[in-house]
Amino acid sequence: MSEQEKDQNNAEPQVETVEEQQAAAAAEAVEPTAEEKLAEVEVELAKVKKALAEADVRAQAEVQNVRKRAERDVQHARKFALEKFAGDLLSVADNLERGLAALDAEDDALKGAREGIELTLKSLLDAFARYNIEQINPADEPFNPELHEAMTMVPVPNVDPNSVIEVLEKGYQLNGRLIRPARVVVSKAP
């Protein structure tokens, strides 16, 4: 046999083998039936529906969170809108109290002025109460650094250490939030 014949004999089985492989692949790759295609489409549709449902739940949760956050911000703004204004009025209350302390209670000539200042102070404190502005007057109470500012410490016998012995300036809170701490003198051990 010549080499050409050998090559042809060798080539033919390879061609047949390739043809056989193609035929086998074609037989395996039989086109799916309409029912199989429908089943595949239904599976894909179910996946898409599930993804959309999850996205919808997340979107609704986000909307609720935004709504709650906005409501909380509005409540916070309403609750503490007066904070700066109230802070400015504190000095008025302080000055009225200082004026009362400076007036001689025994002097009949100043009785009318004293009553006028007392009524004005009472009116101001009533307005504070209507808007939840509370006065902090910690006389004879234990020192609380969250509500009080110690201006000085003085050794005092027969008084518990860290007790407020004098209030220099009353403190105030608006809806539980400290506007100004009470400025106090605190006792220390002798």
UniProtKB/Swiss-Prot annotation:
SUPFAM superfamilies: Coiled-coil domain of nucleotide exchange factor GrpE, Head domain of nucleotide exchange factor GrpE. It is found in: Cytoplasm. One of its GO terms (biological process) is protein folding. The keyword Chaperone applies. Residues 1-33 are annotated as: Disordered. Residues 11-32 have a biased composition (Low complexity). It holds the Pfam family GrpE. One of its GO terms (molecular function) is protein homodimerization activity. Belongs to the GrpE family. Participates actively in the response to hyperosmotic and heat shock by preventing the aggregation of stress-denatured proteins, in association with DnaK and GrpE. It is the nucleotide exchange factor for DnaK and may function as a thermosensor. Unfolded proteins bind initially to DnaJ; upon interaction with the DnaJ-bound protein, DnaK hydrolyzes its bound ATP, resulting in the formation of a stable complex. GrpE releases ADP from DnaK; ATP binding to DnaK triggers the release of the substrate protein, thus completing the reaction cycle. This is Protein GrpE. It comes from Alcanivorax borkumensis (strain ATCC 700651 / DSM 11573 / NCIMB 13689 / SK2).
